[in-house]
Every structure is written in structure tokens, then in C-alpha cells.
């Protein structure tokens, strides 16, 4: 720990945390690298081989393993799958990624900043290799799409 604050009940296991704040009951590590400027909320997780820089992580959000989250805001109760990267640098400028609350991101994703993923978002169709997903079509809202037991 270097110039870091760790709140009560938080656990930091075999990790480097520098210039960051770790919220109550957060779980960090093992082998997490937190560069300066991170703010992790309560009951968050930054797991094995996760690197973070200037990330703001909402309460209950999990980044369990093998991910880079830099210059990003993640909402509350969001889950980031392994191998997810927020690509924040275009060779000249740093850009920001925002991922909302209650978002479930699968494994192996690349978010090329600047980009925003809204609350509760899901990509529901296959995406071919070497493709980019974006939408300029009419948005369809499916209210109550989660099963009752999951709400």
C-alpha cells in the first residue's frame, strides 16, 4: 500500500495499491495492480491480475480477473467478465469509458473510448469476427425482461 486508504472490512491480498481509496468490505487481489486515482465503492471486487488506473467503481461492482480498467466509471452492481479492456489511449489523447449500473459484461471485451454503455445494457445478437457493434436504428425497450426471481 502506497498513499492508499482502505476502509473497514476491506481485504487487500498480495497486491499493489497506490494513491487509491478502497471502500468498506471490498476485496482486492491477489496480484491486483492499482495505479493512482482509483475510487472503489463498498463491497467491490478487483480480483486476480486486474489493473486499474483512475477508475471509479460503484458499490457492489465486480472485476474478478484478467482485466484492465483505466479512465473509467463503472456503476453499481455491474459485473465485468475476464479479459475485458477499456482502451483509453488513441496514441495522442486519453479518453473515458462509462459503463452503467446493473450491466453484465461477458469475457474478452474491448471498449474503445470514448464510449458509454447505459444501465442494464445487454448485446443480444451474435457479432461476427472483426466487427464493431453500434446501433443507429430505432431503439426497442423490453420492460421487465428479467425473470421475476432475478429482479
Tell where the protein language model's regions lie, with residue ranges.
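Glycine-rich hexapeptide-repeat left-handed beta-helix
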Residues: 3-5, 12-151
